[in-house]
Amino acid sequence: MVGKALGLEFNKKIINTLKGEQMNPDFIKINPQHSIPTLVDNGFTIWESRAILVYLVEKYGKDDALYPKDIQKQAVINQRLYFDMALMYPTLANYYYKAFTTGQFGSEEDYKKVQETFDFLNTFLEGQDYVAGDQYTVADIAILANVSNFDVVGFDISKYPNVARWYDHVKKITPGWEENWAGALDVKKRIEEKQNAAK
């Protein structure tokens, strides 16, 4: 979605981690951590989606709207990006993505961590329109991607009114939302297939 916001086109190569394609020696040469996404930009390689987002807006942004130069604004954006990486994505993986391999969602304790994560996000959004303050930034885009995955697998976002308000707004203004949602629907389909096979 950041690429769309910046008007960039990518030469995408799909790596199927469920089939272990990330362990291909050619991919490991590019990224020894064998994680996705990975960006190769004119010979420069970087991975971890939030690091990629910041790199792209710093290099290709026409202005600093998505990642302001103001150090305090950057600090809040970075905190939200780290929150997304350290809490939001792991709770998604631990509760919902377990179904990719087992056909079963995670434990009740895992679900409580999902709720706690959304409580934090709801608090961040109290009295403001965007996750890192008064303007739309890369933090909104990163967190939108994860919130959409929670949404598609049935997590009740409406219990978190600030998150629900933000989500309804940000998905309307984010370039590439439709492609992101299509990916989220694919996640849902794969989880449902695994759940049906486990019955």
From Swiss-Prot:
Job description of the protein: Has no glutathione S-transferase activity.
Family label: Belongs to the GST superfamily. Delta family.
GO CC, alphabetical: cytoplasm
Binding site for glutathione: 34-36, 48-50
Record protein name field: Inactive glutathione S-transferase D3
Gene that encodes it: GstD3
Domain GST C-terminal, residue spans: 70-199
InterPro entries membership: Glutathione-S-Trfase_C-like, Glutathione-S-Trfase_C_sf, Glutathione_S-Trfase, Glutathione_S-Trfase_N, Thioredoxin-like_sf
GST N-terminal domain location: 1-64
Gene3D superfamilies: 1.20.1050.10, Glutaredoxin
Assembly: Homodimer.
GO BP term, example: glutathione metabolic process
SUPFAM superfamilies on file: GST C-terminal domain-like, Thioredoxin-like
One Pfam family here: GST_N
Organism of derivation: Drosophila melanogaster
